[in-house]
Each structure stands twice: as structure tokens, then as C-alpha cells.
Amino acid sequence: MHPLVTSFFHQPSSTWTHVVVDPATQRAAVVDPVLDFDYASGTAATDSIRAVIAHLQASRLKPDWILETHAHADHLSAAPHLREALGGRTAIGAGISDVQAYFGRALNFEPAFRTDGSQFDHLFVDGERFQIGNLPARVIATPGHTRDSVSYLIGDALFVGDTLFMPDVGSARCDFPGGDAGMLYDSIRKLYELPERTRLFVCHDYAPAGREHRAQSSIGEQRRSNIHARDGISRGQFIEMRSARDRTLGAPTLLYPAVQVNVRGGVPPPAESNGVAYLKVPMRAATPRQAGDGARGLDQPVPAAATGTGT
């Protein structure tokens, strides 16, 4: 079956949000909705998700599901805003509980913080099947970038989160907690078992100069030409390349705000006694920054102003 897919690009975080529609029933799912966030002022805004909501309303579409491919570290989720406006069940992979447990400890969350994934309406397990209208959908666990990463196969459309990028960009970093380059390679090869004509939709596109941003590729295109993971690249070669590359990457700009909100299902931390919610930035003693610090802030706090893409 062939769902209709409309994709919305969030320029500040290079993120694609996808609206997936069963044309027979006008039921929909929204994959990876984005909340605008200005780090300097600590201000969240709903401009991006309002465009998605307006599209759904204008097309008279009803979202059954609001699907997260993982707890993102580079943008904040707008899932609660979308659910409040139009309904739909929020869902993520069951591995979120491991991610919640890690960050609850690493960032010293409030004692009442739950690490059972109950901030989401549903936790998917590998191979689980569901529907969007009459469209068959299946969950494929794709760990490697993060422990909770999943891909959604909806009809002939595959939504891979950060598991793969466009072929000329490659693959996602694996230096976050629970990340593993070997696991990512195995996840990619599992996706490559799907038919080559399967449409593949990415969560991010860091387009090289001279190319427009793209949301869609295919399994066949990825197998032929992905610069990191095309056919013929061995597991050992991928691990060596990915590990070396990750050592050169800085932490994402919105790392700390994003993980604190996203592991809570897109909801900010509880307000403190003055009625204001705060986002933490851990700090360690000043030392010379070393090459290859990468995302080490997740294990040893580094200034959150360090920047880097997800590739």
C-alpha cells in the first residue's frame, strides 16, 4: 500500500517532520514533530508545529498516531502540542526506559521522574504491528545511534529516524549513551533486506553545498550509494569509519534542553517553587578542550554551547 507523505523541514535543526496519510480513510500519523526553541532566551515557540497542524486541518486529516523514532538530542519534540490540538496517541520504542534511566541519573532529575516510559501513550517493541486507517504498519528496532531508535514501515514507506541520512551524507553518530557503531551497521543491514523500491524518509538532511534538502530516498539508492553504508562496506570498515568520525564531532547545540524535554515525552521538567521550569546544563572544572571530546558531555559534562551535526 502507498501512503501519501507530506514532509515539513525545520531549518534550525535540519529536521524533517512527516505527515503520513491513508488516502482511503483520511487517517494520519505524524513522525518526529518539532518544537521551536531559542537557547539564548530559553523560549519555546510553536511556529513549526502550527504549520503541520494547519496542513492536517485544511486537509481534514485526523492523526491516529504521533510517532517518535527516538528521544532526539538536537531538537525538542512538539508531540504534546500536536496531541492537544488534534488528538492522537504518542508512541516511541520501548528502549526509551533505558534512555530515561540514564539521563535521570546523569542529570540528577527530580526523584519523582518515572523511567518506565509512561510519559508516552504507547511503547513499541520490535516487530509490533499497528494500523493507520487501513494502512498496515510495522515497527523495526534499529538501535545504534541510540538504544531506543526504531524505524516505522508504513505501507511502502519507511521512516528511519537518524539511522540513515541521504546517501551523500551517510549515517548518524553513535557516541551517545547506548550508541554502538556495530549495532548501527546491523540495523542498517536489516533495513536493506526490504525491497529496493521501498521509499525511505529521513529525520535529518545536512545537505552539502549546492544541493537542496531532501526528505526521501529509497532502499535501493541507499544500498548503491550511501557513502558510509553502501553494499560492499564491511562491518569492520563501518565501525572503524564511524568511530573515527564520531571522535571529531562536537555536542549538538540543543543537547541538554532536548534530552531533558524529550525523555519526558516533550513535556518540560516540573516547575519549581517560583512557578518556573528550568533546564539544567551541567558544568565541570575548566580544562583544555581535547580533540575528539565529541558528545562526552553525556558521560562527563561539557559546555552545551559546543556544536556539531549528527553525522
Q: Which residues fall in each region the model found?
A:
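Conserved beta-strand hairpin/beta-sheet module of binuclear metal-dependent hydrolase folds
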Residues: 2-62, 151-160, 167
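Accessory terminal helices/loops
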Residues: 2-3, 186-199, 203-311
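Core dinuclear metal-dependent hydrolase active-site scaffold
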Residues: 5-8, 19, 126-154
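Active-site environment of divalent metal-dependent phosphoester hydrolases
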Residues: 13, 37-38, 71-76, 97-100, ...
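Divalent metal-coordination and catalytic microenvironments
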Residues: 20, 32, 70, 82, ...
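Active-site neighborhood of phospho(di)ester-bond hydrolases with catalytic His/Asp-centered motifs
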Residues: 31, 62-71, 90-94, 142-144, ...
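Active-site HxH/HxHxD metal-binding segment of metal-dependent hydrolases
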Residues: 35-43, 47-135, 224-225
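Active-site-adjacent loop/tail segments of enzyme domains
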Residues: 171-194
